[in-house]
């Protein structure tokens, strides 16, 4: 009787703003895993091989094979682990400043649901290539609590385990005095109770 193959759970998020990578094909070794994967979209969690070496290739949309890859990355995932992999950075630096290199940023210990029933777990990732080191401040519920401190580009700030309420967040520079951007985060309105998500 053959032993079952070891697997890991993986979600891939396309966050590369490079126009050359506005949509890509994702290969697992030579097999097409995700076809025409668009910027700012996420795959579902899927089973991936664990405890073996494999290559992820990123190719232009409508590629014909893994040989068309513009970037490749080698992995060996831990069995029974859950990962989020975010594609970030710039493929071709022309016209971009700053232009951090294209990379796949891996987070182990990802969640497919909130760890506490009734909450919403939010994994914070700083994926803006031209934003400074930032703080994230919540103003609607907590009255100004800093919920993420000094996150730099490509950093995962870990999970926020939040009551499922409607929040307003401000992204500020690392001094905490200059607001870069404000966002509504209506977790309750969107029905995200018990969910885990990445922002």
Language-model-derived ranges and their functions:
Residues 1-199:
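Intrinsically disordered, low-complexity polar regions and short flexible loop motifs
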